[in-house]
A protein has these predicted regions:
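Short, glycine/charge-rich beta-strand/loop segments that flank catalytic centers
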Residues: 94-105, 123-136, 200, 302-307
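Basic, alpha-helical terminal appendages of large translation-related enzymes
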Residues: 1-7, 51, 123-128, 132, ...
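A glycine-rich phosphate-binding loop feature that marks nucleotide/adenosyl-phosphate handling sites
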Residues: 128-133, 304-308, 361, 394-402, ...
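Cys/His-rich short segments
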Residues: 117-180, 184
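Generic structural concept
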Residues: 371, 375, 408, 412, ...
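N-terminal Rossmann-like or analogous alpha/beta NTP/dinucleotide-binding catalytic cores
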Residues: 2-122
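Structured secondary-structure scaffolds
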Residues: 2-50, 102-106, 156-387, 432-434
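Long, amphipathic alpha-helical stalk/connector segments used for oligomerization, subunit docking
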Residues: 350-353, 357-361, 366, 381-430
């Protein structure tokens, strides 16, 4: 493993396999993928982890409904996730499954460490449990139904509003209550541990309200990782699932290679999660790590839900199959293509908040940004270059001060502005920086009128200057859009005969103005973003 570069370790949640992957799981994964691609281009040695959460009562129930064993069911689901990630150009370096031997070994090692820590004890759990959410609730946290579609007085999950199960069983408990002050100190000393900031406020408020010890083993079913020192118990699904992040970088493996990887990779720089699992990642997970003396992840970024507008009420609603308003990833791919899909969800939906989506808005963004602006710039510029310079780019100007050069002025400092936005996962803001250059280049065409310059032999140098600047703007924009749209950006570079640049890991260096060689063949090609509608 090359450790000459700084490590950047980013993760998605590992996804439940009770159903096929949907827009929400794809959303989390593309957020992480864009960051991973960006960090590779900026010189980091990236490890990008995703995977499947295969244990727990919810998965066992889904398997039973399909007439399969839990292992058969999870084996049947894995290809659905891998196929969608491949289709969406996800560049993960690892795909972990919690049924793998490496996870079993790591979880059993965790149990031994927890036992040694003194933060584990055996007791009896008597309370409420939500199978769909895989979450325990106290009597004060639950609600009682007065809705017509539930039995009156029935205990409902405060998160998903489905009926709860009453659970009474012997269990091992993790002393989560012992970490209230330690967690609050963490939030004080590292205010960016949870992002966006308003999510940190939610987490802090929850912890300030007091923490109960957490039941971390189950005895009422057997689909899980066995507790090594008590064969009648299996591991609570979240106690298992959260550890996957460390399992993937060698936790608990007693070899020099594994220890070196763990030292290099851990802690993770970013956990990307949905807001519905923020307490597990920002309360339980850091407390677990504190208990066993391991470093904490640097940032947990919690994105919002994808919502759709109810045609009758006009209100935004969370997508769900039960409401009949769910949109399948393939529906969006069929409309926008993969690159348009990635672009829309990463730039028009603000990651930290809930985002209302619609096919009308998708078409509007695609046509305005990709077809009319970016795609149009590529087509017009390459067409003029080929037409006026015999299928090639013009020679590189001897001086960039010979004529007015508005594009070079915008490009000055562009990479730094873009990187600041990308570092903060503000993909919409980063896109705006690039689109400023693209819009300026389109205006530059209208203002400089290359077609008129081409008719005047005395303007040959100015024509070459204008076309070169347009091609150079395309080259730089392609590099900056690469994390969002890897295939079309690489294709834009190929049409400029700059395909070797696509693998660059020096983003600042490669985006310096004036690196286009000049004189090389260029290709207009088919439109990269055909207009919709």
């Amino acid at each position: 493993m090359d450790q000459s570069k700084p490590s950047f370790f980013i993760t998605t949640p590992i996804y439940y396999v009770n159903a096929d992957p949907h827009l929400g799981t794809a959303y989390s994964t593309i957020i992480a993928d864009v960051q991973a691609r960006y960090r590779r281009s900026a010189g980091y040695n990236v490890k990008f982890l995703t995977g499947m959460d295969e244990h727990g009562e919810k998965v066992a129930e889904a398997a039973a409904k399909h007439g399969m064993t839990p292992q058969e069911w999870t084996d049947s689901q894995a290809p659905h996730f891998k196929e969608l990630w491949s289709k969406l150009e996800i560049s993960n370096d690892d795909f972990i499954r919690t049924t793998e031997p490496r996870q079993h070994h790591a979880v059993q090692y965790l149990w031994e460490r927890m036992k040694e820590s003194g933060y584990l004890y055996k007791g009896s759990y008597d309370g409420w449990y939500c199978v769909p959410e895989e979450t325990y609730f106290t009597e004060t946290q639950v609600t009682k139904s007065d809705e017509k579609n539930h039995t009156e007085g029935q205990h409902l999950c405060p998160d998903c509003h489905r009926p709860l199960e009453r659970v009474q069983e012997e269990s091992y408990f993790f002393k989560l209550s012992a970490f209230q002050d330690k967690l609050l100190k963490l939030y004080d000393e590292h205010p960016d541990f949870v992002e966006p900031a308003f999510r940190m406020n939610e987490v802090r408020s929850f912890v300030e309200g007091g923490l109960n010890d957490l039941s971390v083993s189950r005895t009422s079913f057997d689909w899980g990782i066995q507790v090594p020192f008590d064969e009648g118990h299996v591991t609570y699904v979240w106690f298992d699932a959260l550890l996957n992040y460390m399992t993937a970088v060698g936790y608990g493996v007693d070899t020099n290679e594994a220890r070196a990887e763990l030292a290099y990779r851990w802690p993770a720089q970013f956990h990307i999660v949905g807001k519905d699992i923020i307490r597990f990642h920002c309360v339980i997970w850091p407390a677990m790590l504190m208990a066993i003396g391991e470093a904490l992840p640097e940032h947990v970024f919690a994105h919002g839900f994808l919502t759709v507008r109810n045609a009758e009420t006009g209100k935004a609603e969370k997508m769900s199959k039960s409401r009949g308003n769910a949109i399948a990833p393939q529906d969006v791919i069929d409309m926008l293509g993969v690159e348009g899909y990635r672009y829309y969800f990463m730039t028009d939906v603000v990651p930290g908040t809930d985002g209302a989506i619609s096919f009308d808005r998708m078409e509007q963004v695609y046509n305005a940004d990709l077809a009319n602006s970016w795609g149009n710039l590529i087509s017009r510029s390459l067409n003029m270059s080929g037409k006026y310079f015999d299928g090639c780019a013009p020679a590189k100007p001897a001086s960039f001060d010979a004529f007015e050069n508005p594009l070079a002025k915008i490009a000055d400092g562009l990479v730094e502005r873009y990187m600041a936005k990308m570092d903060a996962l503000d993909y919409g803001g980063a896109k705006d920086e690039v689109m400023e250059l693209i819009h300026a280049a389109n205006h530059y065409i209208e203002d400089s009128e290359p077609w008129a310059l081409a008719k005047d032999e005395t303007k040959a140098d100015e024509l070459a200057f204008v076309i070169y600047n347009l091609l150079e703007a395309i080259r730089i924009a392609a590099h900056l859009l690469m994390p969002l749209m890897p295939q079309t950006s690489a294709e834009a570079l190929r049409r400029l005969s700059c395909e070797d640049e696509a693998a660059s890991d020096d983003l600042k260096g490669i985006c310096a103005w004036g690196l286009l060689a000049g004189g090389q063949p260029v290709e207009k090609g088919e439109p990269l973003f055909p207009r919709l509608g």
